[in-house]
C-alpha cells in the first residue's frame, strides 16, 4: 500500500506547470525587450559594425555557456539532437542577431518593433506545426487580436511603412529565424534542459562566430564609447544567454503556443526603452496600444490557465497522452479486465496496479 499511495500522489504539478511557464516566459521577454534599443546604440555612429555586434556577443555568451557546461559536467547531446541544435543556433545565435543588427543601421528601434511584433504569432504557428499542441479557439482569437493591436500601434508609432524596404525584409527574415529556433528550442529544452539547450547551441556555433568577429574587427576597427561597450556587454550576457535560460524554461513548461504569446508584450516594452534610452517619442496613442496588447496577451495565456490539459500535469511535457497513443495500464484494469477473464479466474491476475505504479 505504501508503494501504491506514493506512486499515485501528484503534489502541485498541475498548478506549478500552468503558472510557471508564463512566469519564466515573461522574465525572458523582459530581458529581450532591451535587445533592440541597445543594439541600436551599439551600431550608432559607426562605433561597432553590425557584424561585430552580432557575432562577438555570441562569443561572449559562449564563454559563459561553456563554463557552465564544464562545471556541471553535462553529457553531450546525442544523434539528431545536434541537428536540432543547429536549427536553434542558426535562428537565435546567428540569424536573428545578424539580421536585426544590420536592419538597425537603417531604421529606428520603434520601426523594428513593427515586424518583431509578429514573432509571437509566427512562433505559435510553428509550435502547432512542430508539436501536437492544439490551442482552443479562444486562444487564436486572442492571439490574432493581440498581433493586430501590436502591429497597428507599432506602425502608427514608427510612422508606418513607406513601401517594403530593405530593413523590413531583414526584420521579416529575423522573425522567421527566431520563430523556428524558439519552437525547436522549446522542444529540445524538454530533453536537454533549458539552459543546456542554448548553451550547446552557442558552443556549436562558436567557431563560425569567432571567425566572423575577427573579420569584422579587421574590416572596421572598434571606436566604441563606454555606453556602447556597456550595451554590448548586456547583449552578450543577458540577451544572448541569461534571457534564453528563462525563455526556454518557459517554453519547456509550456504549453509552447500559449507561452509564445507573452512576446506580444515585448514591442510595448521595447518602445518604452527606446523612449527612455534613445529619446523616441512615447505618445498617448502608444500607451493605449500598449494596454491593448497586454490585455490580449493576458487573454491568450489565461485560455490555458483556465482549462488545464494533460500536458499541465508534467512541467517538462513527459507523460502527455498524445493522439493515437496507448492508454496507461491502470486505465484498463478492474472491471474492463474482468470482462475478458474466464469464469472463476482469480481477480488479482487482472490487476496491473503494482506494475503501473513503478512507471
Report the location of each language-model feature.
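Membrane-interface helix-cap regions at the ends of transmembrane helices
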Residues: 34, 38-41, 45, 60-79, ...
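Hydrophobic/aromatic residues within transmembrane alpha-helices
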Residues: 42, 53, 57, 103, ...
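Glycine-/small-residue-enriched transmembrane alpha-helix faces in small-molecule transporters
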Residues: 1-55, 61, 160-187, 208, ...
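Specific transmembrane alpha-helical segments of multi-pass solute transporters/efflux pumps
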Residues: 31-36, 66-116, 152, 236-254
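Transmembrane alpha-helices of multi-pass small-molecule transport proteins
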Residues: 2-7, 45-95, 122-126, 176-184, ...
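Hydrophobic transmembrane alpha-helices of multi-pass small-molecule transport proteins
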Residues: 65, 86, 118, 126, ...
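Helix-helix packing/entry segments at the starts of transmembrane helices
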Residues: 25, 29, 55-56, 93, ...
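Juxtamembrane helix-entry segments on the extracytoplasmic side of multipass membrane proteins
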Residues: 17-22, 46-55, 77-83, 155-177, ...
Amino acid at each position: 500500500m505504501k508503494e501504491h499511495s506514493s506512486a499515485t500522489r501528484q503534489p502541485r504539478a498541475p498548478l506549478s506547470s500552468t503558472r510557471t511557464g508564463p512566469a519564466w516566459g515573461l522574465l525572458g521577454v523582459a530581458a529581450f525587450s532591451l535587445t533592440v534599443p541597445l543594439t541600436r546604440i551599439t551600431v550608432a555612429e559607426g562605433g561597432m559594425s553590425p557584424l561585430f555586434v552580432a557575432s562577438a556577443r555570441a562569443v561572449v555568451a559562449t564563454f559563459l555557456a561553456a563554463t557552465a557546461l564544464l562545471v556541471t559536467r553535462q553529457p553531450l547531446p546525442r544523434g539528431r539532437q545536434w541537428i536540432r541544435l543547429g536549427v536553434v543556433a542558426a535562428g537565435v545565435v546567428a540569424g536573428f542577431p545578424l539580421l536585426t543588427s544590420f536592419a538597425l543601421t537603417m531604421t529606428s528601434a520603434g520601426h523594428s518593433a513593427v515586424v518583431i511584433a509578429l514573432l509571437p504569432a509566427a512562433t505559435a504557428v510553428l509550435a502547432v506545426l512542430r508539436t501536437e499542441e492544439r490551442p482552443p479557439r479562444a486562444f487564436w482569437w486572442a492571439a490574432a487580436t493581440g498581433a493586430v493591436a501590436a502591429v497597428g500601434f507599432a506602425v502608427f508609432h514608427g510612422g508606418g511603412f513607406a513601401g517594403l524596404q530593405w530593413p523590413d525584409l531583414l526584420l521579416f527574415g529575423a522573425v522567421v529565424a527566431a520563430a523556428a529556433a524558439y519552437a525547436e528550442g522549446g522542444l529540445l529544452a524538454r530533453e536537454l534542459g533549458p539552459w543546456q539547450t542554448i548553451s550547446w547551441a552557442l558552443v556549436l556555433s562558436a567557431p563560425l562566430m569567432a571567425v566572423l568577429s575577427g573579420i569584422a574587427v579587421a574590416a572596421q576597427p572598434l571606436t566604441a564609447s563606454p555606453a556602447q561597450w556597456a550595451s554590448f556587454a548586456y547583449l552578450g550576457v543577458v540577451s544572448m544567454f541569461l534571457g534564453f535560460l528563462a525563455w526556454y524554461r518557459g517554453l519547456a513548461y509550456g504549453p509552447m503556443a500559449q507561452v509564445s504569446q507573452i512576446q506580444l508584450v515585448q514591442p510595448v516594452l521595447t518602445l518604452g526603452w527606446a523612449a527612455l534610452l534613445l529619446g523616441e517619442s512615447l505618445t498617448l496613442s502608444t500607451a493605449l496600444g500598449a494596454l491593448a496588447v497586454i490585455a490580449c496577451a493576458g487573454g491568450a495565456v489565461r485560455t490555458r490557465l483556465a482549462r488545464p490539459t494533460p500536458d499541465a500535469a508534467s512541467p517538462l511535457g513527459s507523460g502527455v497522452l498524445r493522439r493515437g497513443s496507448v492508454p496507461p495500464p491502470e486505465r484498463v484494469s478492474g472491471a474492463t479486465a474482468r470482462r475478458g477473464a474466464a469464469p472463476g479466474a482469480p481477480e488479482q491476475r487482472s490487476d496491473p496496479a503494482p506494475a503501473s505504479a513503478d512507471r
